[in-house]
């Protein structure tokens, strides 16, 4: 019922928008899984930087094995979205290292490109990545998962738009976004990845877009959908915490 309500709200939020959208959201504890064109491919832009860091951690053996220089580059790449730092770490990991991580993570839909920002993602694969970062598993150590999420929690204020839109107080937010005017400057690729944890909930959301006439247009498209997701989950959790009495949110 929650997924059906959410799907309807997302469809309403998208009505009249020019953007193409791929969306995936899951809260395993609530049994929630919801998607919209989650298998469609979108140009990554800086959303790929979470995968670059994750692949680096797999290659080096974990967060405890990173050099001071690698840590400095990782912080700049995630918290400030430094392209120069991404260039350096992409070169260190290499296409082979990136593909090994994708294979281990089960991210079989992701299409690597020699230019990291032109790698093609799907919302379903990005949700797989976010689930990997927030759940125990064999791919990344607990310290590595915590390291990535800590950096995502420290993204600078001007880059914390997108999936956190409308999030309630007391919810921990980890976010990484991407934006690219490609190929003509009239088609912005705007993407947002987020994980959220609060009382009674821990969920992940990936929203990828293309066909945006401006950056703000794409951000607004993502945030309209994200507000639906964040509102619906908050209301459902509040209903559960009240004992599930009264009318279920609908």
Language-model segments: residues:
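Acidic/His-rich structured neighborhood in mature extracellular/periplasmic domains
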Residues: 45, 68, 107
């Amino acid at each position: 019922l929650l997924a059906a309500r959410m799907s309807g709200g997302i469809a309403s939020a998208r009505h009249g928008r020019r953007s193409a959208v791929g969306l995936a959201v899951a809260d395993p504890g609530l049994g929630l899984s919801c998607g919209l064109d989650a298998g469609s491919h979108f140009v990554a832009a800086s959303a790929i930087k979470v995968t670059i860091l994750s692949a680096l951690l797999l290659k080096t053996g974990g967060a405890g094995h990173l050099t001071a220089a690698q840590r400095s580059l990782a912080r700049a790449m995630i918290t400030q979205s430094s392209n120069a730092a991404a260039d350096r770490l992409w070169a260190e990991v290499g296409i082979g290292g990136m593909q090994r991580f994708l294979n281990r993570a089960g991210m079989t839909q992701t299409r690597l490109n020699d230019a990291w920002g032109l790698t093609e993602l799907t919302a379903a694969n990005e949700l797989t990545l976010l689930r990997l970062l927030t759940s125990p598993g064999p791919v990344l150590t607990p310290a590595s998962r915590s390291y990535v999420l800590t950096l995502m929690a420290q993204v600078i204020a001007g880059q914390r738009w997108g999936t956190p839109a409308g999030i309630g107080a007391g919810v921990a937010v980890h976010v990484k976004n991407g934006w690219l005017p490609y190929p003509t400057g009239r088609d912005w690729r705007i993407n947002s990845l987020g994980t959220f944890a609060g009382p009674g909930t821990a969920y992940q959301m990936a929203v990828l877009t293309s066909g945006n006439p401006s950056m703000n247009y794409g951000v607004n498209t993502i945030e309209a959908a994200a507000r639906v997701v964040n509102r619906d989950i908050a209301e459902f959790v509040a209903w559960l915490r009240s004992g599930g009495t009264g009318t279920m949110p609908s």
